[in-house]
């Protein structure tokens, strides 16, 4: 049935709503192995009545949501009451709760402790990066909802347990799942049954620190910083130091039999050479693509800020002055190396940050949409938004001088080799809005996000610059929740009138 042809007919409108109700009510939690049928068909549940569009929520039925939060529902009601643009209200209501609605698995362990698995969406595994970003916007509500606080606590503890298991892994399987998908067990690395994938990415160890620190700052709950926390921190420090490559290549290698060049590493799994200069090597980017030069600059900035947060916790909560000092010394070393090796004197933009370097003098001048990115440095708080080098870098990455910036008839933004040419990631558009100090620029970004959802009411991994109906990943919870985070931040920053002018 094509709902675009429904006009002023109560019978047909009622029938459409009945079909929707049946579709929602007949789903169960296993339905979320594929949410395409209820959530992603363009315009499937956008009805028109007297030439006015009626937007029907694309959230799953209450009984089918994987996790319920009174605080999140209250925040949705609070925000939607303030927004006058019906389509923007609809998109916010769809996107902001997508993580808890469709990806959170909360468990209570035998000892009564909290344990939360946060799937990335259409892939049934928990990335340390994605999970830390997916639940991040809910932390501000933790004191208003005990169930939400326990879910967040369980996420952090699960991240600590994962780091204890293997600090080099980026994604983990659900130990409560009786039939996990061991898709990458044939990878030539130290794979374990508990792992989904073992790509070494610096940010995998940073996102848990960022989340734990913010949870502690908001709630004051220090109960998460016990034995598992200390073991995880030991692994984080040991891994960061090993990947400074001062004592050789280190223990980590990775190879995969694949047709994708960036899904494996050169030089027998060790990657391209680096010169030990104090920076931390990252075999892969936050896109899960192999680095060209292993000193990945945005991730090294992220490591500095994360280590400083960890040092504060260790000093204040654990009274572990030695480990806190170890974090601070390492952060100082990496920060000094960044100032020495990460800056490029660009003939057009002046001093900018390179995306990757190798310590030998080689620099890669690009940006990739995935966060941490050069554009997202200010969003993560790794640099001041008014830092002149950051502003120069921001101008560079949002231009056609960045090889992975694409501009078309549908939109513009940064992509990356993970999806390829001409594919813009909405995440980059959101990062431009997050880091903007210009109302016209922010408004332009929001309008572009609204215009490139292919009529689905959700964010996607990427869309074609000339045709948003050509998109990848129909169910990518991180980008959905990030959109909700952006709208809330803009309202908190006094930008409601801007949003209501769209």
Residue spans for each PLM region:
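Bacterial N-terminal signal peptides
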Residues: 12-21
């Amino acid at each position: 049935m094509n709902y675009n042809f429904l006009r002023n007919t109560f019978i047909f409108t009622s029938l459409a709503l009945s079909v929707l109700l049946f579709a929602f009510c007949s789903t169960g939690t296993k339905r979320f192995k594929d949410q395409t049928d209820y959530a992603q068909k363009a315009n499937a549940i956008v009805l028109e009545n007297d030439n006015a569009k009626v937007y029907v929520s694309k959230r799953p039925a209450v009984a089918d949501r994987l996790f319920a939060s009174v605080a999140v529902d209250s925040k949705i009601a609070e925000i939607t009451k303030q927004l006058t643009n019906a389509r923007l209200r609809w998109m916010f209501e769809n996107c902001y709760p997508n993580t808890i609605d469709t990806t959170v698995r909360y468990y209570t362990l035998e000892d009564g402790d909290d344990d939360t698995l946060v799937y990335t969406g259409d892939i049934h595994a928990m990335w340390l990066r994605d999970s830390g970003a997916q639940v991040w916007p809910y932390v501000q509500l933790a004191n208003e909802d005990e169930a939400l606080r326990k879910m967040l606590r369980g996420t952090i503890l699960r991240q600590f347990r994962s780091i204890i298991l293997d600090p080099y892994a980026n994604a983990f399987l659900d130990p409560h799942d009786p039939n996990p998908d061991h898709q990458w067990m044939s990878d030539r690395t130290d794979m374990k049954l508990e792992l989904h994938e073992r790509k070494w990415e610096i940010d995998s160890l940073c996102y848990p620190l960022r989340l734990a620190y913010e949870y502690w700052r908001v709630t004051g709950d220090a109960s998460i910083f016990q034995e598992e926390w200390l073991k995880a921190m030991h692994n984080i420090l040991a891994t960061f130091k090993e990947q400074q490559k001062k004592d050789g290549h280190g223990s980590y290698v990775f190879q995969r039999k694949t047709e994708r060049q960036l899904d494996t590493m050169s030089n027998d799994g060790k990657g391209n050479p680096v010169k030990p200069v104090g920076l931390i090597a990252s075999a892969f980017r936050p896109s899960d693509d192999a680095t060209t030069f292993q000193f990945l600059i945005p991730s090294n900035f992220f490591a500095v800020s994360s280590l400083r947060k960890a040092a504060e916790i260790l000093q204040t909560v654990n009274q572990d002055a030695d480990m806190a000092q170890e974090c601070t010394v390492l952060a100082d070393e990496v920060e000094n190396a960044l100032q020495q090796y990460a800056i490029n004197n660009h003939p057009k933009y002046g001093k900018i940050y390179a995306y990757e370097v190798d310590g030998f003098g080689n620099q890669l001048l690009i940006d990739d949409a995935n966060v941490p990115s050069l554009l997202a440095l200010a969003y993560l708080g790794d640099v001041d938004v008014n830092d002149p080098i950051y502003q120069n870098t921001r101008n560079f990455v949002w231009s056609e001088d960045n090889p992975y910036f694409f501009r078309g008839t549908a939109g513009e933004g940064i992509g990356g080799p993970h999806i390829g040419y001409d594919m813009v990631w909405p995440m980059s558009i959101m990062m431009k809005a997050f880091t903007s100090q210009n109302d016209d620029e922010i408004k332009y970004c929001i309008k572009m996000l609204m215009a490139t959802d292919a009529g689905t009411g959700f964010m996607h991994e990427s869309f074609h610059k000339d045709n948003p109906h050509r998109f990848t990943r129909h169910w990518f919870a991180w980008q959905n929740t990030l959109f909700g985070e952006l709208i809330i931040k803009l309202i908190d920053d006094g930008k409601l009138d801007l949003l209501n002018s769209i």
